[in-house]
Structure formats: C-alpha cells, structure tokens
Amino acid sequence: MRKLFFLLVLVCLYSSCSKKDNDEVISISDDLPETIKNIDDDNNIEGKSYCENGIAGIYPCNGYDLLSRIPLEHFESNEGNDSWGWTDSLNGKEYALMGLDDGTAFVDISNPEIPLYLGKLPSATVNSSWRDIKVFKDYAFIVSEAPGHGLQVFDLSKLRSDKTEQIFESDVNLNAFGNAHNIAINEDSGFAYVLGSKLFDGGPVFIDINSPLNPYIVGGYSFSSYTHDAQVVKYNGPDIRFKEKEILFGSNSIGGENNQIIILDVTDKKNPELISSIEYSNAGYTHQGWLSDDHKYFFLGDELDELTIG
C-alpha cells in the first residue's frame, strides 16, 4: 500500500533513520505556540489545528492542517522511528502502524481527527531505536536492530476488535537472521527482502511470504556492501531487456563509503544477477530512494549530504 498520511501521528525527531554512531540531531527552536487543544485530556491526544500564518499548532505548515497528534508518552514509549499503513479491505478502515523503540503501535485513523490507539506489539527481544514495518495480505512484517529480533508477523485482522490499548502477540517469529535495519516487500511476487542483517554481508535476504504464517528464506545476495533500504518491483520501464523482471533498487554502503546504488535482478532467487552499481560524489549517507511510476527514474535521498557537505 502506498499512501501518504497527513495525519501527524507523533513526532519522532529524536532518532535518525540511519544506523550511525555519529548521527547528529538538529534542534530547531522558534517562537512557536506552546499548546494545542486536546481532544483527550486524560491521554494528551491533541486535536485539530488549522494552518495559519505558516503554523499549525506548534508545527510549520504550508497548506495543510494538523488533524491530530498522539504524543509518544501515550504509547508509553520513548522513541519513534518508522511508520507504514494498512487499509482493511473488508470495511475500508485505515490504520497507522508506528514503529517505537519498544514495539509497534497500531492506531485507527479512519477518523483522522479522533485517532484511536488500539494497542502495541512489543519488541521481540529488547528495545531499539530502529524498527521497520511493511504490509502484505493483511499481515504486518516487522524487523528491528534489536539483537536477535528476527521477523515478526502480525495478523492485522486483530485490529477489527473494538478494544483499545491492548498488548498484542505476534503470530509468527522467524529468527533466522537476528537483527536487521529494514524490510522491503514486492506485493506482485510475494517476497520480502530483509536488509542490513548479519546475513549476506548486510545485503538483501530473500524471504517467501506468499503464505504469511509460513515465511522461509530462499536465498540472498552479497555484493560486499550493506543495503540500507530498497525498492523491489516488477519492472515495466523503458529498458525492454528487463520487462516483467523482478528488479531490486538498493541504497548501499560499500567499504564504509555511503555512496552506492545497486540494481539487481532478483527474478531467480537462487541466481540473482547484478545489473549495475553506481557510486556518486559528495555523498553523506545513501539512505533511500523510490522509482517514478513509469520506472524511468529513481529518486535518491541522501540523508546527510547537506549536513556534512553543504
């Protein structure tokens, strides 16, 4: 599911998305309003704030209102990291899946002005600043940098209950690769790609999830480089040699230099083939990228180039 939510579920400025020991945190202190009207005083859930004079509540804005905000303390967590979404095909309800230092939170945002915190799936092992979530066939697939975490599989149909603030349990734990930084899923093929684990030098690990409750590793790829993030698609771009092939676009780091993109044919999971590797100058940290809808362009996001180079 590729959806863009303009509901600000929470603010997670504390931790950067990349795992680097020397990550910097930038503090922005402007003369902003200090309070927003709460819709739930007991739980400090903040209500709607219109974008006026470039500010919605305490946040800069440009043409978008802040519909609501759930602070981290409502989840009884200290840090947030990543988020994904799920739309229930049975009733059209929309949910936010929020990565936390101690687990994953599930929030019903069908009415974005009155979000409902449904509960948390605790981390499989210990806390970590890094967690990533993707969805396939009404299941959430979750990895974390927490040691020994592996892959959690969670049946999202549990969210159809009217109960709130529950503590959930995962349906499956695949512990074959330990910790990992990221996960990508190609819904067309039913394969997940675990990224930045201890296997394959941190390269992608191929996991068959067509049966979500029975995931299993079928292979992987090592280019002697760490894959931080990836997008995997059934390619329908201008290069006819790879039409309908399953192609991985990876944001990589090689030899400590965080400046690489790899393009990999993963159609045959037993025999993945490198199509191209690209390195660029003035790099800070090759963080993530996304293809245009026509698969003609890959838009790369470097996390730190403006910070370290200017």
Residue ranges and their predicted role:
Residues 18-310:
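Feature marking well-ordered beta-strand scaffolds used for ligand recognition
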Residues 7-8:
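Sec-dependent N-terminal signal peptides
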Residues 1-4, 19:
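Positively charged n-region of N-terminal signal peptides that target proteins for export
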Residues 13-16:
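C-terminal motif of bacterial Sec signal peptides marking the signal peptidase cleavage site
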